[in-house]
């Protein structure tokens, strides 16, 4: 029986490392799911802001990351597009030519900390399109966002 004493430690090391990997995998899956849900909600909020705020207002892109998602950079991952009546992106949007606003999150990589697996995964693109409303202009003049 004494000769088997080391075997239990080896078994525990193998099984324990697999269980820890499974535990970290569950935690990382929860964090990745939270990140995707937060970015989806942030995209919806930013599209709503884009519909009522002046064209190219910087507060639109910052609204996407309202939950503080780790590793997210609004300047590189958020694209705000102003669309015409046919849904084509406008190169130089003006108040009279914008019919829809579209906010999308692209190329965001979710960092992972699971030992032995990939260090990151790329999230799918989120895009929300809404009809343009006031675009920051009212009867009293322009309004700030």
PLM features per residue range, with description:
Residues 1-66:
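Alpha-helical assembly-interface signal, strongest on the long, hydrophobic N-terminal helix that forms
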